[in-house]
A protein has these predicted regions:
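C-terminal juxtamembrane segment of a hydrophobic transmembrane alpha-helix
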Residues: 1-10
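N-terminal pilin/flagellin-like segments and related low-complexity appendage regions
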Residues: 13, 23-238, 242, 250-275, ...
């Protein structure tokens, strides 16, 4: 009996660790790629095809094709990386229209990333969006080719799949009420194209991110902020990412009275029978750093 119990708990904890490491790799890679616009380098130079469309958008109410927008109207601030600190369902719904009520686990961070893929596209899909660029000018379009481009992208040129994502912790894994917190992301992979939900790892109970801001323009972080403004995010050069993971099954012989202190989230003293671990990593955000060093 004891051997069976030990095996079950080892398996439970091992699965939690594997899931958490996978989740950390996924979000760390996406954050490190924020602001990658292929050879174009500068998001503000992206132009938009006249027939660019999106099925399910995911921006503030009233803003059309927000997921495609590389910069903020009016300020010109880059939208490559955005943060909602210790979000609630109300704050995430105001910023991202594709979230449904009660989906987010309140008090966890939400991270929005805009970038293109790391390699040129092969065959183009009618249900995807692309950046066509020659390194001097670029056009964002949906479908297999731009039909009303505002600028001509002369050869040699390449097409790059547009890969925006929004990471968050969902309250449930498979259905509302199952109470299995899960790291998910909204991604531009639905028909239309449009935003859809992809879940990465179950048992992720909290996501916290601290952003390294370069205030002296030397390419290195001077301060780490958990709740940066969009203006401050223009000089982000790195990020520290924290995940709190728990087992999906309880351990009937265990009570978890540990205190978990992660970033600026309130301390957690669960008092339940789930095993937990904190996983963390740091990443450099080279694309935004390079733009800053270029004085863009």
């Amino acid at each position: 009996t004891n051997n069976s119990y030990s095996f079950k708990q080892d398996e439970n904890i091992g699965r939690m660790q594997d899931d958490a490491r996978h989740a950390l790799r996924e979000i760390a890679f996406d954050i490190s790629m924020a602001g990658h616009y292929a050879d174009l380098h500068i998001p503000s130079t992206v132009a938009y095809d006249g027939d660019l469309t999106i099925g399910q958008d995911c921006g503030p109410a009233g803003q059309i094709n927000w997921m495609y927008q590389a910069t903020e109207a009016g300020t010109g601030n880059s939208l490559s990386l955005m943060a909602i600190d210790n979000a609630t369902n109300a704050t995430v719904a105001a910023a991202h229209s594709c979230f449904i009520g009660g989906e987010l686990l309140d008090g966890t961070d939400v991270v929005s990333i805009k970038r293109v893929a790391g390699a040129e596209a092969g065959a183009l899909s009618a249900n995807a969006a692309y950046l066509r660029t020659n390194g001097t000018v670029g056009v964002m379009f949906s479908g297999v080719a731009p039909t009303a481009p505002p600028v001509v992208v002369a050869a040699p040129r390449a097409d790059w799949a547009f890969r925006p994502t929004i990471y968050y912790v969902r309250q449930f894994a498979n259905a509302p009420g199952d109470n299995i917190p899960t790291l998910c992301r909204k991604a531009l992979r639905a028909a239309g194209p449009g935003m859809t939900t992809e879940c990465i790892a179950t048992g992720i109970e909290n996501l916290q991110v601290e952003y390294g801001i370069d205030t002296t323009e030397d390419g290195h972080p001077n301060v780490f902020l958990s709740n940066p403004t969009l203006t401050q995010m223009q000089t982000v050069v790195s990020a520290r990412i924290f995940l709190v993971a728990r087992t999906t099954d309880i351990d009937t012989r265990y009570t978890n009275n540990k205190t978990y202190s992660v970033s600026n989230a309130p301390d957690l003293v669960p008092g339940d029978s789930f095993h937990r671990r904190v996983f963390s990593t740091s990443v450099s955000i080279q694309n935004i750093r390079t733009m800053n060093m270029m004085g863009v």
